[in-house]
Amino acid sequence: LWFLSEESGWSHLYVSDGKGAPRAITSGKWEASQPQLSADGKRFLFLCNRAWPGDYEVCEVDRNGGTVREVTALDGVEDFVVSPDDTKLLVRHSGSYLPPQVAVVDIRGGKATELTDTRTPAYKARTWIQPEYVQVPSKHGAGTIWGKYYGPKQLEAGRQYPIVMFVHGAGYLQNVSARYPNYFREQMFHDLLVQRGYIVLELDYRASEGYGRKWRTDIYRRMGTPELEDYLDGLDWLVEHRQGDRARAGIYGGSYGGFMTFMALFKKPGVFKAGAALRPV
């Protein structure tokens, strides 16, 4: 029997013979997901985010445990299947502005052979503002809050920039990753905002996926409080490190992000000068 468990505080792979306590095959402050047993039954393949929480690769480990090896080097693996002869992986992967594509990777490692490119010539001709993955220190004892920052390549000396903060939905969802975002439309809007002189920050606030059990469950019976603390810390970070103008800060989001927009406006009136709660729940 093999399964995933958060017993350690992080999602990891365990095996059990049904007689004794389950034994961990993987460990560490990262998450294992989508495990598959190889056709010969000798090793497990799974997704892992060992390098940083938003970097997903296919990893491999012996069925008895040991060293974990990263098979791919694509940064944004979405899912995969193993060939019947255990020699190749069919991988679906993506990037910040790269919609999911299909590639083949030798299971021993090596460069991916791309099978698809669904982007149009017009799309590929555009120059997009790439997100910067940032670590915002929590002033509320939560540790590191991962974020995606969009801004000009070079900040103008002495200039203060109006701020837009985006709140992802679902709660238990990871938005700060190297993958193509669920919120690709909002990402394109953020690209436009930067062209219009704004700076933008998205955060994987407490409740988000990919950061361990405690981060995911920290809002239990207090929804709307830890998440807002994280966004207030993000606002401080923009002011202190990206020349953000605290007097011109707005916030928006949809679904749970809409709920959090309301929480920000109602619980901290005056901090955000504008808010847009889209389809709030």
Stretches with model-predicted labels:
Residues 5-8, 16-39, 48-51, 60-78, ...:
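Multi-bladed beta-propeller domains
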Residues 6-11, 50-56, 95-98, 185:
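Short, solvent-exposed loop/turn segments at conserved positions within beta-propeller repeat blades
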Residues 3-4, 202:
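Short catalytic-loop micro-motif centered on adjacent basic/acidic residues
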Residues 1-3, 44-45, 89-90:
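Hydrophobic beta-strand positions that form the internal "hydrophobic ladder"
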Residues 77-281:
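Serine-hydrolase catalytic core recognition
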Residues 12-14, 57-59, 101-103:
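A short loop-to-beta-strand structural motif that recurs across blades of beta-propeller domains
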